[in-house]
Amino acid sequence: MDVFACIFFFGWAHFASILFFAWVELSTHFLLSKEKLPMNKTRYLTQAAIIAALYAVLTHMQNLLLPGTTTWAIQMRISEAMNVLAFFTPAAIPGLSLGCLVFNLTYAGTLPLDFLVGTLATFLAALAMWKTRNVKIGKLPLLGLVMPAVTNAFLVGWELTVYIGGGFGINALYVALGELAVVLVLGTALYFAITARSLDKSLLALD
């Protein structure tokens, strides 16, 4: 009975994940349709696939070297620094979402609903970062940089409260601190590295 239950759960999880990613892709195009971006479809899909693969691989590698650091309450996924790619290309929105989804589905230590909750938090953060990419303090899109902390604090904080217990406030705070530490330090460094080398006009261009 347990075997059949596992098969049913994983089958349902993969089916739900396919539907969810289809929704992410469709909603991304709908939300960006009014921006009339010069976009090469092949380049867009290639960027999204590469970003997804890098996110999933980096997170798995970190978990092998430092077990648990990608799934604890104060989780510090190094791959979350890649969120800044959403400032440069809309392909990062489905790319980061799919990368998060792949890791959460292939790592046994994630919470039961993390493949949906975590992916939704990543999608909303990436979308918000793309939308606020031109809102800058000095040369830094500071408003966008805090978006991963906000979305993950609320959604993953709620998930931790449901499955692990403790107060929502403290869980949300722990998640936010982990996100801020990675995105504000590593993410900011990656952001300036991309702009300094004009990679946003070459590797991350869509036309």
Regions found by a protein language model. Name each.
Residues 10, 15, 21, 30-31:
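Short hydrophobic targeting helices and cationic amphipathic motifs
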Residues 55, 96-104:
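Small-polar-interrupted transmembrane alpha-helices in polytopic inner-membrane proteins
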